[in-house]
Swiss-Prot record:
CDD domains xrefs: HisA (cd04732)
Active site per the UniProt annotation: D10 (proton acceptor), D132 (proton donor)
UniProt xrefs under HAMAP family: HisA
Protein name, entry field: 1-(5-phosphoribosyl)-5-[(5-phosphoribosylamino)methylideneamino] imidazole-4-carboxamide isomerase
UniProt cross-references to InterPro entries, sorted A to Z: Aldolase_TIM, His_biosynth, HisA_bact_arch, Isoase_HisA-like, Isoase_HisA-like_bact, RibuloseP-bd_barrel
Keywords: Amino-acid biosynthesis, Cytoplasm, Histidine biosynthesis, Isomerase
NCBIfam families: 1-(5-phosphoribosyl)-5-[(5-phosphoribosylamino)methylideneamino]imidazole-4-carboxamide isomerase (TIGR00007)
Catalytic activity field: 1-(5-phospho-beta-D-ribosyl)-5-[(5-phospho-beta-D-ribosylamino)methylideneamino]imidazole-4-carboxamide = 5-[(5-phospho-1-deoxy-D-ribulos-1-ylimino)methylamino]-1-(5-phospho-beta-D-ribosyl)imidazole-4-carboxamide
Compartments where found: Cytoplasm
Species annotation: Methanopyrus kandleri (strain AV19 / DSM 6324 / JCM 9639 / NBRC 100938)
Amino acid sequence: MAFVVIPSVDVVEGKCVQLVEGDPERRTFESDDPVETAHQWSEFFPWIHVVDVDAARGEGDNSDIIGRICEEVDAKVQVGGGIRSAERAEELIELGADRLIVGTVAFTDKDDFSKIVDVCHDHGIEVFVALDVNENHEVLVSGWKEDAGVTLEDAIERFNEVADGYLTTAVHVEGKEMGIDEKVVEKSTGATDLPVLYAGGIASIKDVKRAKEAGAYGVVIGTALYHGDIDPVALLDLMEED
């Protein structure tokens, strides 16, 4: 499986933002047009990662923007944030999502999560489980506001039979450009044969290479791209090495 780099388009109140530790009040980047932002990234990358931050926190819904990105942008789109029912999964699939990232409900309601997986697989859509972890590598849910009561490795063991992959985010370095938590990557890839995407703290090409060497299927990058600290062309070269 070829290594992938996926730019993140995080949506809060209809705007594309970059946040520190997922906090909507701590913004390091803001744009009024998430669709145009996604379009710009699609010129370099085959996938776009769209997060409905409002939905993840139970504070809103940005379905219209998600739908426009899926329809207007020439890239595959993986969507996360607030997917807590089969009905919501169905809506996002109908909007054009190519992969869903599911977090909270996977830990809080086994039956609802199973229904989401069934709906996705019926449509040929992959489900990646979101593993958002703190500095102790414990999983957080509900927009990173609550402890799920399970460690990273135990969570992976729980979902290996039903998930298609994982998106592991090191929340404690998210948006800070202070380097990746390499142990998070190693623990994730060491606990599963499924593809693992990593996010959090990426500040340089070196960080991306470290994640790749640790076994990640790919990385999701936000802040470093938006701040111009990583050249998209260099990332293209890295992906093409495979």
